[in-house]
Amino acid sequence: MIKHQFKLSDPRLLSRIGYQFKQLELLQLALTHRSVSHKYNYERLEFLGDSLLGMIIANYLYHAYPNENEGRLTRMRATLVRQEALGKIATDLQLSRCLILSTGELKSGGHHRESILADTVEAIIGAIYLDSGDLNLLKDIVLKWYIPYLDHIEPTDQLKDPKSRLQEYLQARKKPLPVYEVVDIQGDAPHQHFKVECVVDGLPKIYGEGSSRRFAEQAAAAEILKLLEQ
């Protein structure tokens, strides 16, 4: 049950977010993982925040890049709203210390799991919108979070997803394509957590995790690319 006398474990979170909640229980809900409660958790707020974030970023890109076509704008948006980008936002906001997790989830490292942190960012976006009812205010807050990343986004082919980039990298060097295999699935559908192994000739096995097989494969491919680009 959501507490009406909720106290943040880190009061400075509000300052980092850049918004003072009138209904603090909405922020509490946005920070609460389903391992704590199947009914009172961030998943509905995440659903709302995901749509709002996509709209905010799409609107920004539409006006910032008037000469780019739909395909490139789509890739740019995907780069800015994917799990990896949201994980960086979560790190900037220092969300890991504020998550409300079950004891088991906490012990398993859930407070550092990128998928949980990314979901929480989207849930906070949904919570701010419901609390303020002000889309323009929400847009300003979200774009402030993205300031360190917007200046570095470019409409190039590098904005392809990690799996596509890894495949092109290997094909260009006439090397075998990567092999992906699911090695672990936790939870029940539709709230599962996947762990995927990625094997590339000449490199150690790399693992990626995510809320779907696709996200886990992308995470693994991103780690392989980091190794190859060193």
Swiss-Prot record:
The keyword rRNA-binding applies. It holds the Pfam family dsrm. Keywords: Cytoplasm, Endonuclease, Hydrolase, Magnesium, Metal-binding, mRNA processing, Nuclease, RNA-binding, rRNA processing, rRNA-binding, tRNA processing. GO terms for molecular function: double-stranded RNA binding; metal ion binding; ribonuclease III activity; rRNA binding. It catalyses: Endonucleolytic cleavage to 5'-phosphomonoester. It is found in: Cytoplasm. Residues 161-230 form the DRBM domain. GO terms for biological process: mRNA processing; regulation of gene expression; rRNA processing; tRNA processing. Gene3D superfamilies: 3.30.160.20, Ribonuclease III domain. Its main location: cytoplasm. Digests double-stranded RNA. Involved in the processing of primary rRNA transcript to yield the immediate precursors to the large and small rRNAs (23S and 16S). Processes some mRNAs, and tRNAs when they are encoded in the rRNA operon. Processes pre-crRNA and tracrRNA of type II CRISPR loci if present in the organism. This is Ribonuclease 3. It comes from Acinetobacter pittii (strain PHEA-2). The lineage of its organism: Bacteria, Pseudomonadati, Pseudomonadota, Gammaproteobacteria, Moraxellales. The gene is rnc.
